UniProtKB/Swiss-Prot annotation:
Source organism, top-level taxon: Viruses
Gene coding for it: SIFV0002
Stated name of the protein: Uncharacterized protein 2
Length: 81
């Protein structure tokens, strides 16, 4: 499986979650929106948080971040890979 496909699967899982968070510098920020944007030939993952942080990440950067999601009342923490 290609790196971009792994990143897209993680993004899809995060989009479907009831609540989603990203850990930035050891602090948890609630994710408001995740979308894939096309910059040059490489797709980027844009994450907008509740605190106003906007991250534009390459697939490899996206996969190195730590995420936390809550779906159907079940809490799950994971790194992209």
């Amino acid at each position: 499986m290609k790196l971009i496909d792994l990143a897209k699967n993680i993004a899809r899982e995060l989009k479907e979650a009831d609540e989603k968070y990203i850990i930035i510098n050891g602090k948890k920020e609630r994710i408001l929106a995740i979308e894939i944007v096309q910059i040059t030939s490489m797709p980027r993952f844009q994450i907008v948080t509740e605190k106003g942080t906007v991250l534009i990440l390459t697939p490899s950067q996206f996969l190195r971040k730590k995420y936390e999601l809550i779906k159907n009342g079940e809490k799950k923490s994971f790194f992209g890979v």
